[in-house]
Swiss-Prot record:
Name of this protein: 3-hydroxybenzoate transporter MhbT
Induction description: Induced by 3-hydroxybenzoate.
Pfam assignment, any one: MFS_1
Entry GO terms, CC: plasma membrane
CDD domains, per database record: MFS_PcaK_like
Organism ancestry: Bacteria, Pseudomonadati, Pseudomonadota, Gammaproteobacteria, Enterobacterales
InterPro entries with a match to the protein in the record: MFS (IPR011701), MFS_dom (IPR020846), MFS_trans_sf (IPR036259)
GO MF annotation, one: carboxylic acid transmembrane transporter activity
Keywords, comma-separated and alphabetical: Cell inner membrane, Cell membrane, Membrane, Transmembrane, Transmembrane helix, Transport
UniProt-listed PROSITE patterns: MFS
Entry membrane topology: Multi-pass membrane protein
Length: 452
């Protein structure tokens, strides 16, 4: 007699095993290399500027092109992942950004480098959201928030590592060598992912793959053998309209739009600080080596904040936790501007900003994965990240604009604090929106993040 097993209930009843930790580690390494690239470009920018005798304004297209590619990659690869699978898309995207990062090292001029940074961004933008989706779909409800944020700490650690390593190695190997390093490592990882990274069992069920294939995938997670078993998902079947339209179906529209505002504002801050902080500090007379350590405090704070918020989000109302965190982040941003004459006080304020802003962004990614069902989850996460990348483009460009307008140091950071306040307000409104049971799809009952 065929037994029927609901996948999420099965995952919830089992401990987190070796197969799930393998997925977490693989995805951790992917986002770590993404973080490395994000930070490295900010630290090699002064060397590129000197190499081609550019102005600060000339660097804006370099930052903007990569972020435009990130946006396009997220928009394209979310629906592709929902159709062709998480594993294939992640592997392809990692190989893509590795290849074009390597080619960027040999760009003959700024125009070609800008073009290659756009192509690098396509791979980066497609990989990151799908790692969130993949990790989320492998985990039991009780551990999902904490473990997805743990996985995404790879981004903040990669950013901290990329900044410090770039600052130390640029005098030795130049900006070309940093881009070679940033290209070779993803290519090695892409090859390793082929045998190491399994496919999502939720995607396999939703795409109606043979039950024997699903049984092997699930058996590798639980350590059990499943003969004559039918696996199913306790969520609505995919509709005819496709995964994109489901983001805006009924009252889901309000939740999607509010999420997008938070993503836009949050990544605006993160990329503005990541791209321009070394230049801003250098402009204040701080040498690049010291600037790298001070800027690394932002990413280290983000790692600490992500781990802390992941635990708090699993225990308390996640929307309120993130709203409070963004509010505290806004206060710390203001403190950066008020501490321009005290390097250690500035580093402490930047560390606090990392906790409140970068840490919250990691938590926001984990939260978003719970708000959409399997058939539209990768699209929902990817499109939210794509909107966030639009904010990142605005942030990376606005840093140069504010410097050109000769904003004072404290005024500049007062302006940067405004998006953090907006994010906090939107999350408070999201708390009200998700109280309505008709607002959220059936992904929430099995989500690892609950309202209290």
């Amino acid at each position: 007699m065929t037994q029927r097993l609901e996948l999420q209930k099965l995952l919830n009843a089992a401990p987190v095993g070796a197969r799930q930790w393998r997925v977490i580690i693989c995805c951790f390494l992917v986002v770590m290399l993404d973080g490395f690239d994000t930070a490295a470009i900010g630290f090699i920018a002064p060397d590129i500027r000197s190499h081609w005798q550019l102005t600060a304004g000339d660097l804006a297209p370099l930052f903007g092109a990569g972020l435009l590619g990130l946006t396009a990659g997220a928009l394209l690869c979310g629906p592709l992942s929902d159709r062709f699978g998480r594993k294939r898309v992640i592997e392809f995207c990692v190989a893509l950004f590795g290849l074009f990062s390597l080619l960027s090292a040999f760009a003959p001029d700024l125009q070609m480098l800008v073009f290659l940074r756009f192509l690098t961004g396509l791979g980066l933008g497609g990989a990151m959201p799908n790692t969130i989706t993949m990790t989320s779909e492998y985990l039991p409800a009780r551990r999902r928030g904490a473990l997805v944020t743990l996985m995404f700490c790879g981004f903040t650690l990669g950013s901290a590592f990329g900044g410090v390593v770039s600052a130390q190695l640029v005098p030795l190997i130049g900006w070309h060598g940093i881009l070679v390093l940033g290209g070779v490592l993803p290519l090695i990882l892409a090859v390793a992912l082929v045998p190491l990274l399994p496919e999502s069992p939720r995607w396999q069920i939703r795409r109606q793959l043979p039950q024997a294939t699903i049984a092997r995938t699930v058996g590798a997670i639980t350590g059990e053998r499943y003969n004559d078993t039918h696996f199913w998902l306790d969520e609505p079947a995919a509709g005819a309209k496709g995964s994109i339209s489901q983001l805006f179906a009924g009252r889901q529209l309000a939740i999607t739009l509010m999420l997008w505002v938070v993503f836009f504002m949050s990544l605006l801050i993160i990329y503005l600080l990541s791209s321009w902080m070394p230049t801003l500090l250098n402009h204040r007379g701080i040498d690049l080596q010291h600037a790298s350590w001070v800027t690394a405090a932002f990413q280290i704070g983000g790692t600490f904040g992500a781990l802390l918020l992941g635990v708090l989000m699993d225990r308390f109302n996640p929307y309120r936790v993130l709203a409070l965190s963004y509010g505290l982040g806004a206060v710390c941003i203001v403190m950066i501007g008020l501490s321009e004459n005290g390097l250690w006080l500035m580093a402490l304020a930047i560390f606090g900003t990392g906790i409140g802003i970068s840490g919250s962004q990691v938590g926001l990614n984990a939260l978003t994965a719970t708000l959409y069902p399997t058939q539209s989850r990768a699209t929902g996460v990817s499109w939210s990240n794509a909107v966030g990348r639009c904010g990142a483009i605005v942030g990376s460009l606005s840093g140069g604009v504010m410097m050109a307008m000769n904003f004072s140091f404290d005024t500049l950071f007062f302006v940067i604090a405004v998006p953090a306040v907006v994010s906090a307000v939107m999350l408070i409104l999201l708390t009200l929106a998700v109280r309505n049971p008709t607002s959220v799809p059936a992904a929430l009952p099995s989500a690892g993040i609950v309202n209290k």
